[in-house]
C-alpha cells in the first residue's frame, strides 16, 4: 500500500531570501524489492554473481523536498532506496547517485526509469541510496537547466538533508559516511556536489567520504565545447539545444530569440520538443545531421573570438574541476567516448595534480564508447564505494571489504600489492565477466597479459581493489 510520510521543519532559505520558511519533505513508498528480485535484476544487467550479492530487501520512496533555485525555493523530487533488515544501532552510509542525461520527466529515477533501477542494486549492498531527479525533471515542471552545476549540486545536497530529516519516520540511522557517484551528466553533477561538500559549508553537515564520477564534462569551457564544435557533426545534437535553452533559463543572457542560435526550421521546433515529454531519440531525429545546418553560421566565430561572450561565461561558470579533493576521488573515462570526451578527465587530473592534490585518480576503463563505458563505470564505482563502506555487524561498524592498496594505479606492466609477501595468494578478475584471468603468489602482479581497462585484484588477507591498466 502506498504510504505517505511528511515531516515539517523550519530552515533558512539559502538563496536570495534571509527569512525563514517552512520546509517540508515527503516520502511516498513506490515499490519494494526482495533479495531474489534484486539478484535476478543483477543477472539481467549482466553483473557477475561472484562480484555481487543481494543482501537486503529494499524499499523505494519518491521523496519531494525543497531546494533554493534562482533566488526562490522550489520543490523537486528524487528516489530514495532504503535497505531493510538493519537493527539499531546500525547506521547506513549515504550514497548519492547522480543520473545521466534525460529529456522526459517521467524517465527520472523517482519514476523508476531504467537508470533509477540501479538504486535498488546499490541499496541491497547496505547503502542508503539517493537519486535526485534535478530541477525540471521528475515532478518538477520547470525547464531543466542541463549541466548547470549549482542546481545539480543543490539537488544532491538538499536531498541529503531531506533523507537525514526523514530517517526517524522511515526507520534508519546514518553512520556519517557520504559517497557520490554518477555517469555522464551525472558525472558532472557528482563532481559539482563533491566540490561543494569540500569547499563550502555543505561539508560541515555531510563530510565527503569519497566520490567516483564517470565520463562527465568537467571542463565544459576548455574541452567539451571546443572539441564538440571542432567536428562536422556531434553524436547527440539534442544535447546542444538542451544546453543552450537550459542555461538561458538560468542566465537569460545567451539569446533573446532562439533563432539567434539555431537556424530554421529548428529554432521554431526545439522549445516544443524540450517540453519534458519527448525522449532523446525523438529530439535527435528532429535535428539536422551536421552542425553547419543546425547552428547559426557566425555564432561559433563570435563565441571563439570573444572570451566574454555570454556562452563562454556560462560555460566557465559550470566547469567543475578546479578544486582540491580532501577525500578520495576516482574519475572513470573511456577513450572512445563519442559523447563526453575523455580529455575532460585528463584535464581535471592534470589541474588537481599541479595544485598539489594527492587524493585523485583518472581511471582509463578502455577503448569503449559512451554506452559501453556506462555499465563498467557505474558498477566499478559501486564496487569502489562498497569497499570503503563501514558495514554493521552486531551493532559494531566494520569494513565490508578491505580495500587493497596497489601502486602504481593506473599501471602498465606491473603493480605492487601493499602489505603482500612472497607467499601471498592473489587473483585478477574481470569486472565485466567475473572470471579469474590470472592468479599467483607474491608481492607483485605482472600485467602484460591484461588488456587496457579496469580489473579487480583480490589478495588473501589484504582485501580487493580496482586496478586500471593503461598503455
Q: What is the predicted function of each stretch?
A:
Residues 70-75, 83-121:
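Short, surface-exposed "cap/lid" segments of acyl-processing enzymes
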Residues 214-322:
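Accessory cap/linker subdomain of secreted extracellular hydrolases
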Residues 307, 312-313, 339, 346-347, ...:
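C-terminal catalytic histidine-bearing segment of alpha/beta-hydrolase fold enzymes
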Residues 390-407, 413, 435:
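Residue-level detector of functionally pivotal "anchor" positions at catalytic/ligand-binding pockets or at interdomain
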Residues 146-168:
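Alpha/beta-hydrolase active-site loop
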Residues 23-87:
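Catalytic-loop region of hydrolases
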Amino acid at each position: 500500500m502506498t504510504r505517505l510520510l511528511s515531516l515539517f521543519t523550519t530552515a533558512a532559505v539559502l538563496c536570495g531570501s534571509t527569512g525563514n520558511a517552512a520546509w517540508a519533505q515527503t516520502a511516498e513508498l513506490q515499490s519494494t524489492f526482495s533479495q531474489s528480485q534484486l539478484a535476478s535484476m543483477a543477472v539481467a544487467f549482466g553483473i557477475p554473481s561472484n562480484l555481487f550479492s543481494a543482501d537486503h530487501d529494499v524499499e523505494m520512496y519518491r521523496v519531494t523536498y525543497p531546494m533554493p533555485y534562482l533566488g526562490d525555493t522550489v520543490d523537486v523530487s528524487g528516489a530514495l532506496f532504503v535497505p531493510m533488515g538493519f537493527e539499531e544501532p546500525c547506521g547506513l552510509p549515504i550514497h548519492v547517485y547522480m543520473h545521466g542525461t534525460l529529456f522526459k520527466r517521467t524517465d527520472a529515477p523517482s519514476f523508476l526509469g531504467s537508470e533509477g533501477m540501479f538504486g535498488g542494486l546499490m541499496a541491497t549492498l547496505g547503502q542508503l541510496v539517493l537519486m535526485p531527479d534535478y530541477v525540471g525533471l521528475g515532478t518538477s515542471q520547470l525547464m531543466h537547466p542541463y549541466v548547470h552545476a549549482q542546481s545539480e549540486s543543490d539537488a544532491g545536497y538538499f536531498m541529503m538533508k531531506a533523507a537525514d530529516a526523514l530517517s526517524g519516520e522511515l526507520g534508519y540511522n546514518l553512520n556519517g559516511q557520504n559517497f557520490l557517484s554518477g555517469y555522464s551528466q551525472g558525472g558532472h553533477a557528482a563532481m559539482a556536489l563533491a566540490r561543494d561538500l569540500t569547499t563550502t559549508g555543505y561539508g560541515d553537515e555531510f563530510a565527503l567520504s569519497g566520490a567516483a564520477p564517470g565520463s562527465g564534462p568537467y571542463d565544459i569551457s576548455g574541452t567539451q565545447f571546443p572539441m564538440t564544435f571542432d567536428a562536422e557533426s556531434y553524436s547527440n545534437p539534442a544535447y546542444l539545444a538542451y544546453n543552450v535553452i537550459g542555461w538561458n533559463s538560468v542566465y537569460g543572457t545567451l539569446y533573446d530569440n532562439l533563432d539567434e542560435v539555431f537556424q530554421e526550421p529548428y529554432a521554431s521546433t526545439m522549445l516544443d520538443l524540450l517540453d519534458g515529454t519527448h525522449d532523446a531519440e525523438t529530439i535527435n531525429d528532429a535535428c539536422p545531421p551536421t552542425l553547419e545546418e543546425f547552428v547559426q553560421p557566425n555564432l561559433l566565430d563570435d563565441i571563439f573570438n570573444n572570451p566574454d561572450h555570454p556562452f563562454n561565461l556560462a560555460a566557465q561558470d559550470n566547469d567543475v574541476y578546479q578544486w582540491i579533493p580532501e577525500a578520495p576521488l576516482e574519475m572513470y573515462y573511456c577513450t572512445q567516448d563519442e559523447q563526453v570526451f575523455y580529455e575532460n578527465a585528463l584535464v581535471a587530473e592534470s589541474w588537481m595534480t599541479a595544485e598539489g592534490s594527492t587524493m585523485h585518480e583518472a581511471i582509463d576503463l578502455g577503448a569503449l564508447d559512451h554506452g559501453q563505458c556506462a555499465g563498467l563505470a557505474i558498477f566499478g564505482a559501486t564496487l569502489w564505494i562498497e569497499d570503503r563502506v563501514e558495514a554493521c555487524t552486531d551493532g559494531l561498524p566494520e569494513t565490508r571489504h578491505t580495500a587493497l592498496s596497489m601502486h602504481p594505479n593506473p599501471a602498465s606492466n606491473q603493480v605492487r600489492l601493499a602489505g603482500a609477501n612472497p607467499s601471498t595468494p592473489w587473483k585478477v578478475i574481470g569486472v565485466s565477466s567475473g572470471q579469474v584471468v590470472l592468479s599467483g603468489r607474491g608481492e607483485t602482479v605482472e600485467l602484460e597479459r591484461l588488456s587496457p581497462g579496469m580489473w579487480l585484484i583480490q589478495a588473501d588477507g589484504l582485501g580487493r581493489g580496482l586496478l586500471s591498466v593503461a598503455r
